[in-house]
Amino acid sequence: MQGAVSYIDGYSEIHGTPGLRPMRSYEGQAMYVLKQKYIFMLFWNETRDHFQQTAWQASDRLALVYQTLNWDTNRQWGVNAIVPFRIGRWLDSRLTLTGLRMTQRCDAFHDLSFDRSKWIGVVRLDNTVRISRKPDLTLDLAAFCQSPAIQGTYDIDPAWSVDAGLRWNFDRKRASLTVRCDDLFESGVPFARVRYRGQWLDMDSGAYSRTFTVHFSYRFGSYKERRHKEVDTSRFGH
């Protein structure tokens, strides 16, 4: 990358990074499937020379500098559990739980350095609710929540979101109409702040994160979905 400087406004600048090194990623995981439905996983991933654009307040002048720099380490390890469950014929749900330890280190972050670690928890619940069969109405409802996190010198506030979609199948299931809203309460993009060794910065990127979509599809003629070979599950004791 070139060392050019571009200006966002009278205070913010974007600096290029000559000599930026490619990152190297390593990862591993161990998974256990219980009763062919419950999934438990241990995971680890580490990126050496990880690069990411972050903000830094210059110490010699009034300027906010955005620059992509190589970090020494970006590491995550933790556990993940996926628990599906069903209530009658009207509710099909999946609960995903994740707990991880994040470590980020950079010894040459402008005139600073950082070596930070944090425990992070993530919960996600996906639900499919059968409202009625005649008419064929289905509600998809998903909720997500994440505890405070870090990103370089940033402290990331907790984040949560709710997504909802209503699907109507009609004309002998050849036609489908879906109305969907993502991030219903505009809470999915967290507030970020820097309070680190004299750096003081607030960043709110969450405005207008709610989205609405309408999707219509129609299957003509006698089209049938292509059948695929079933997966061999004998290794699960089936």
Language model features with spans:
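Structural signature of Gram-negative outer-membrane beta-barrels, strongest in the C-terminal barrel
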Residues: M1-R48, P135-A142, D155, A159
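Outer-membrane beta-barrel translocator domains and adjoining extracellular loop/strand segments
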Residues: M1-S6, G10-I14, N45, H50-S59, ...
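Outer-membrane beta-barrel strand-turn architecture
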Residues: R24, L34-Q36, E46, F85-L91, ...
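Conserved C-terminal beta-signal and adjacent last beta-strands/turns
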Residues: S117-H238
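Outer-envelope beta-barrel architecture signal
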Residues: L34-Y38, W77, R89-L95, P135-L139, ...
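Transmembrane beta-barrel strands of outer-membrane/channel proteins
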Residues: Y26, Y32, Y38-E46, L95-R101, ...
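Outer membrane beta-barrel strand-and-loop segments of large Gram-negative receptors
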Residues: H15, R21, E27, I39-T96, ...
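Outer-membrane beta-barrel transmembrane strands
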Residues: R21-K37, L42-W44, Q76-W77, P84-R86, ...
